[in-house]
């Protein structure tokens, strides 16, 4: 397989999995077993494609918030997005400096996929018993910020899975409202994470030698695919539960745990 086709597939995979509650990190690690490992810079660029995708998909919502800051409800919402991001940034930086992060290898990812699938089923079951609410409380904002840190510590957890369900359990029980808030918080979080990673790479000596055609193709693929996925998901969850994603995670996690010993042998 050519490097260009490999880059295209990885870009599509990033766009498909970044916003679904199935872990983009886990899927990229799995894909790299067959498509080859790419540089950290390549992975940052395809995540930038996902960032652009969600900004485009939510452009009307972002514009509405930006132009409606005169309304108290909009100011309150934006402030809570900011607080959730700050919690992630501060606690995440402390965790990173302390080295509290599992290695991005297949075994912890497999366990995270499996356990995360169970968590999704249990969380949605209990959240479904709550009265439907679409108001973001301060408790939800802080918890979402902390849940993003947890997702960073445990590769394969999925940022969207950990945050959407903690928001639902803590009172933001309407699925579409929980997803909307989580995606809004994800925009500054992903921007900051990518910027921090680029800064660290620069300090360590630059970005190395890249095939810019591969990088460009992967970026465009991640952007287009991510845009389609976000639009589809926001429509899907208005009428459906997350059960299919939970079952998929459990099956994939179990399959990986069964495959790993055979691959090692």
Swiss-Prot record:
It comes from the Bacteria. Bacitracin is thought to be involved in the inhibition of peptidoglycan synthesis by sequestering undecaprenyl diphosphate, thereby reducing the pool of lipid carrier available. One of its GO terms (cellular component) is plasma membrane. The lineage of its organism: Bacteria, Pseudomonadati, Pseudomonadota, Gammaproteobacteria, Lysobacterales. One of its GO terms (biological process) is cell wall organization. Belongs to the UppP family. The chain crosses the membrane at residues 38-58, 75-95, 108-128, 135-155, 181-201, 215-235, 244-264. Its EC number is 3.6.1.27. NCBIfam families: PRK00281.1-4. Catalyzes the dephosphorylation of undecaprenyl diphosphate (UPP). Confers resistance to bacitracin. This is Undecaprenyl-diphosphatase. It is a multi-pass membrane protein. Coiled coil: none annotated. Pfam families: BacA. Keywords: Antibiotic resistance, Cell inner membrane, Cell membrane, Cell shape, Cell wall biogenesis/degradation, Hydrolase, Membrane, Peptidoglycan synthesis, Transmembrane, Transmembrane helix. InterPro entries: UppP.
